[in-house]
Amino acid sequence: MALLTVPISAESRYKMINDDLVNFINEVCDVLEIPVPNISDDFRVFENNTRMAMLEIEKGVPTLYLSDRMETEQDYYFAVAHELRHLWQCLTNEKYWLGNYKTVEEIGITAYNRQRLEIDANAFAALIMVLSFEMVPTFPSLDLETRHMIEVRARQIMPELDD
């Protein structure tokens, strides 16, 4: 089943960076014990229209870019939590998390999704969705093995979130 991606008007996009989203970003950063990155709605940085959020660190300054496209509001929040976990990865142990990183073009989508930094970011974002919205992401586009890897990692992360 294909998911509908709806373009959002400039007026609506402005409303997306609202108090709820800013509060969510602040709360996730607080959980991760990381500084809040700059937030930009300059969606022109996106190479394709399937991503909803993207983290970029330039000269040591992190910026979270928010796209003008979303599948659902929950998907949007998931993408934000996922990208904030990537910031945490860079700030806590960049060599460990990104040491063997490969792009999807280099290794294909399945191997890309199974990289430790992606498994970790997906697991963290899934837990945040459960805690924040009582929603359990099902990852329908991922194969069973990748979903299992995310589930195992989520169980490892859970005690960190109980503190």
Regions found by a protein language model. Give the residues of each.
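Charge-rich, solvent-exposed alpha-helical interaction surfaces
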Residues: 24-27, 31, 83, 149, ...
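Post-HEXXH active-site segment of zinc metalloproteases
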Residues: 74-75, 90-119
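Active-site recognition of the HExxH zinc-binding catalytic motif
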Residues: 78-91, 121
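Substrate-binding/catalytic groove segments of enzymes
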Residues: 88-100, 130-140
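Long, well-structured alpha-helical subdomains associated
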Residues: 111-114, 123-163
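Acidic/histidine-rich, surface-exposed loop or edge segments in extracytoplasmic proteins
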Residues: 2-11
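Catalytic zinc-binding patch centered on the HExxH motif and its immediate surroundings
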Residues: 31, 38-63, 70-74
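Zn2+-dependent metallopeptidase catalytic core
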Residues: 14-36
